Amino acid sequence: MAQEFTFTVNGVERTTTQNKPLLRYLRDDLHIHSAKDGCSEGACGTCTIHVDGAAVKACVLTTALAAGRNIVTVEGLPQDVREAFVYAFGAVGAVQCGFCIPGMVISAKALLDTNPDPSREEAAFAIRNNICRCTGYVKIIDGILLAAKILREGKIPEKKEDFQVGSRVHRIDVAEKVQGYGKYPDDIYVDGMCYGGAVRSQYPRARVLYIRTKEAEELPGVVCVLTAKDIPGQQNVGHIQKDQPTLIGEGEITQYLGDAVALVCARDQETLEKAKKLVRVVYEELPAVYGPEEASAPGAPEVLSLIHI
């Protein structure tokens, strides 16, 4: 009999026999999308959740290790807390793309649970493990401090509705981004949908000698595996010049670490990841260019053959 792992998610007891990253269970099985998958390796903080009240990254915690724990995502926070953060982050302009915001809110709430009146330095320290690529953190810290004030006073200010040119207004999407129900591409789920992913180069510059897809294609649940030879006609893309290959084919040279050499389509995420590992790519590693000085040196490898102005 398979081992069962039981824990509570937002007040509901959940049981699974799968030992996998808790983030994948939350997103794939429960379709809780406030916890974002920004890195899958505990670096960015977009998947931060509460585990027994502490801020924890869900991508590095497994369902086995979560057994017996109380897990809370943004969706499970009390309504007054969510409303306080929605108002505060909207009032100070803390939300831009919004991808990092649910994780920021969770980290901030963990701070306020033990320190309801934090200093600016304490608020900044609380989100030290949460990366934001948009705001520079200043407005997020402003929002945390305002949310703390609102929660201490127990009253959310009324929003000004008589807007005029030049008035400060809240973003119309601030509520969905703070509370995590706004959908990004990775949050979209349709019954029966397939999952796609790229097999990427292990080297910044290398010639692709051989791509073997047979083992991946034979894995149950795999729909198809595509390489450059499956693209009819022009395969280069680009905004100004079409100088970026969609896929690097056999005999061609990669331009950077992570260049795509194959695409895999599967019935589920787990099968997709297994299939990607079964695609065998043989490379001839070539000298790479790591900076402008190397690139401009006599005899430097030519990364792109097109001339850029």
Where do the language-model regions lie?
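Flexible, low-hydrophobicity surface segments
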Residues: A148-S305
